Curated annotation (Swiss-Prot):
Record protein name field: Large ribosomal subunit protein uL22
GO MF, one example: structural constituent of ribosome
NCBIfam families according to UniProt: rplV_bact
SUPFAM superfamilies: Ribosomal protein L22
One Gene Ontology biological process: translation
Alphabetized PANTHER family for the sequence: CHLOROPLAST 50S RIBOSOMAL PROTEIN L22-RELATED, LARGE RIBOSOMAL SUBUNIT PROTEIN UL22M
Source organism (scientific name): Klebsiella pneumoniae subsp. pneumoniae (strain ATCC 700721 / MGH 78578)
GO cellular component, one term: cytosolic large ribosomal subunit
The family this protein is said to belong to: Belongs to the universal ribosomal protein uL22 family.
Amino acid sequence: METLAQHRHARSSAQKVRLVADLIRGKKVSQALDILTYTNKKAAVLVKKVLESAIANAEHNDGADIDDLKVAKIFVDEGPSMKRIMPRAKGRADRILKRTSHITVVVSDR
């Protein structure tokens, strides 16, 4: 049984989150949680919360056994960018893009 959890509009760029997502794709959830716990990146905290949510969803909604679960799919899509202005010298201004991402984790007992 596949169970899904999402974090939409996560305040980190998709490029940065994908580095962490690639570490746990296809792993057992216990091993994936250990990897995320000791990964020293902001994105690891975001992905870990989504993974824990997917595990809880599988246990509560589908009655799955946590020991059998693995990360079947994990993907990160770009979310909307917040546009900000940064003043520069001589009356100019630069545009700053504060990027967001949508993190999706699918756990499965197969």
